[in-house]
């Protein structure tokens, strides 16, 4: 019995423990599980409702999308029709524009082609004419006839005389021209009492003073300041050169600084001119003027044909002594050269002031001719002139310019025929080559 009671008590204890410690958690767990199940069921119901709503919304969206798509398609069709119409209109306008532009281009090309053909035809005509002229003047008699015809035309100009100035005075203004004339007259009176040696010394003294004035710009400017009282200028001049030059040179220079000059450089030009006149007077007394003039003109042509030599003689970087040495070396290699020509050319090279050497040499030759009251005419011909033609050229030009004329002839076969005459700055071009060139230049563009 006790065993049964003990087992009963044990069972009761177990039941108590289970009830006390096991049942409450189980109940709580079951309640939680029930809550979870209920929540899941509620969620499932909500999801089902949402699914139904989503399905309904999807169906509505699909229907709306279909309707919108149909609307977009219709609008696209309308836009396509409108764009097609616009493109057709624009294409028509563009086609018309291209057509008009094409017509203009065709007209422009036609005009250009016509102009080009005319130009080519003109050039070909000139070329053919040139060939005919060349063939015609290949006969010396026909070439001489072109000179005679030009002289006939030139002869008609003879009554209209032109005044030709001294070569040096051509670039001076009126005051300097008067001063130069007075200085030349002073020299002419002084030269009568001087022998050739004194004239040569005078030329050398004047060149040295011209070089001094060329270096001393301020002194030159002071000596040419316009003022009524020339005494201060004379005193300055005497302090500078007294005892260094001879009395004839000092007399010339005193007269020079008393004159009124338009520009400072004109004083140097005038002194250089008188120094040349002194040497030319020596040549005239010795009967060497013709030879001197010929050699000076020949040397100017050499410089014109040899630009390199002209540049070397006018190179201011090289001292004057070096350039004069080069000049003398060239003249010595040429054979016998008139000593006065050597002296004149040496002075010219020493006193170059920005002028090309070939122009300075030509001016020197013109000064030599002008001293005899003659005018220099540079005549260019395709061939040598006969004596009768040369005489006629001299006579016609003498009547035109009212002075005796010295003709310096140059031959250039490229001129074909006729003559080109240059007197100072005036050029009379009656060559066949220039007429052909003028004809070609007048062709339409």
UniProtKB/Swiss-Prot annotation:
Family: In the N-terminal section; belongs to the ATPase B chain family.
Single GO MF annotation: proton-transporting ATP synthase activity, rotational mechanism
Quaternary structure, from the entry: F-type ATPases have 2 components, F(1) - the catalytic core - and F(0) - the membrane proton channel. F(1) has five subunits: alpha(3), beta(3), gamma(1), delta(1), epsilon(1). F(0) has three main subunits: a(1), b(2) and c(10-14). The alpha and beta chains form an alternating ring which encloses part of the gamma chain. F(1) is attached to F(0) by a central stalk formed by the gamma and epsilon chains, while a peripheral stalk is formed by the delta and b chains.
Alphabetized CDD domains for the sequence: ATP-synt_Fo_b
GO cellular component annotations of the record: plasma membrane; proton-transporting ATP synthase complex
InterPro entries: ATP_synth_B-like_membr_sf, ATP_synth_b/b'su_bac/chlpt, ATP_synth_F0_bsu_bac, ATP_synth_OSCP/delta_N_sf, ATPase_OSCP/dsu
Residues that span the membrane, as ranges: 4-23
Superkingdom as given in the UniProt entry: Bacteria
Topology term for the membrane: Single-pass membrane protein
Keyword Cell membrane in annotation: yes
Source organism: Mycobacterium marinum (strain ATCC BAA-535 / M)
Region (ATP synthase subunit delta): 169-445
Matching HAMAP family: ATP_synth_b_bprime, ATP_synth_delta_bact
Gene: atpFH
Entry keywords, A to Z: ATP synthesis, Cell membrane, CF(0), Hydrogen ion transport, Ion transport, Membrane, Multifunctional enzyme, Transmembrane, Transmembrane helix, Transport
Subcellular location: Cell membrane
Stated role: F(1)F(0) ATP synthase produces ATP from ADP in the presence of a proton or sodium gradient. F-type ATPases consist of two structural domains, F(1) containing the extramembraneous catalytic core and F(0) containing the membrane proton channel, linked together by a central stalk and a peripheral stalk. During catalysis, ATP synthesis in the catalytic domain of F(1) is coupled via a rotary mechanism of the central stalk subunits to proton translocation.
Sequence segments annotated as region (ATP synthase subunit b): 1-168
Keyword Transmembrane carried by entry: yes
Protein name (record): ATP synthase subunit b-delta
């Amino acid at each position: 019995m006790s065993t049964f009671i003990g087992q009963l008590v044990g069972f009761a204890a177990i039941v108590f423990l289970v009830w006390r410690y096991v049942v409450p958690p189980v109940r709580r767990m079951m309640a939680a599980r029930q809550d979870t199940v209920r929540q899941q069921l509620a969620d499932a119901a909500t999801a089902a409702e949402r699914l139904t709503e989503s399905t309904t919304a999807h169906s509505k969206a699909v229907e709306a999308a279909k309707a919108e798509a149909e609307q977009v398609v219709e609008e696209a069709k309308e836009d396509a029709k409108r764009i097609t119409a616009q493109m057709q209109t624009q294409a028509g306008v563009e086609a018309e524009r291209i057509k008009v532009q094409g017509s203009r281009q065709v007209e422009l090309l036609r005009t250009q082609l016509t102009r080009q053909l005319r130009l080519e035809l003109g050039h070909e005509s000139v070329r053919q004419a040139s060939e005919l002229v060349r063939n015609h003047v290949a006969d010396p008699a026909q070439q001489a006839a072109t000179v005679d015809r030009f002289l006939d035309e030139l002869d008609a100009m003879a009554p209209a005389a032109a005044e030709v100035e001294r070569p040096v005075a051509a670039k001076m203004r009126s005051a300097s021209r008067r001063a130069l004339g007075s200085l030349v007259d002073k020299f002419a009176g002084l030269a009568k009492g001087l022998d050739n040696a004194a004239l040569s010394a005078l030329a050398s003294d004047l060149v040295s003073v011209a070089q001094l004035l060329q270096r001393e710009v301020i002194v030159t400017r002071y000596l040419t300041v316009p003022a009524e009282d020339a005494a201060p200028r004379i005193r300055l001049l005497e302090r500078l050169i007294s005892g260094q030059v001879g009395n004839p040179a000092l007399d010339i220079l005193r007269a020079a600084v008393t004159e009124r000059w338009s520009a400072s450089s004109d004083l140097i030009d005038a002194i250089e001119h008188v120094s040349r006149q002194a040497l030319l007077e020596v040549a005239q007394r010795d009967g060497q003027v013709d030879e001197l003039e010929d050699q000076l003109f020949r040397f100017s042509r050499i410089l014109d044909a040899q630009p390199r030599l002209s540049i070397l003689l006018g190179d201011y970087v090289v001292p004057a002594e070096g350039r004069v040495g080069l000049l003398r070396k060239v003249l010595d290699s040429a054979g016998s050269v008139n000593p006065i020509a050597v002296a004149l050319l040496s002075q010219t090279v020493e006193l170059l002031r920005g002028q090309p050497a070939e122009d300075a040499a030509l001016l020197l030759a013109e000064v030599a001719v002008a001293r005899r009251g003659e005018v220099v005419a540079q005549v260019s011909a395709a061939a040598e002139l006969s004596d009768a033609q040369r005489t006629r050229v001299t006579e016609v030009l003498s009547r035109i310019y009212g002075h005796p004329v010295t003709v310096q002839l140059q031959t250039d076969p490229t001129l074909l025929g006729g003559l080109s005459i240059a007197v100072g700055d005036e050029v009379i071009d009656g060559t066949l080559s220039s007429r052909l060139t003028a004809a070609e230049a007048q062709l339409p563009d």
